[in-house]
């Protein structure tokens, strides 16, 4: 993968903690908290610094929106996790229904 393509990869850990926090309108402490709650797991650089991907930032931003509405961080992380699990279950259910012959 070329260096330019890495920034187009939603899973490439391109952002430092400070830049990631700035991009989602949060603090580094918030990113540490959602990491400790298990919502996201940033990659660690060789120097031990956290690096975040665009996908991880989208997930963290969803939690931040809930926290901004008054939800505790751990509860917000759990809500986001459950929403994603439900979306995945619905997607799988739809795939299975689509592969079932009509009238079966």
Model regions and ranges:
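Short coil turns linking two alpha-helices in DNA-binding domains
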Residues: 27-30
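Residues within the helices of the helix-turn-helix
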Residues: 17-18, 32
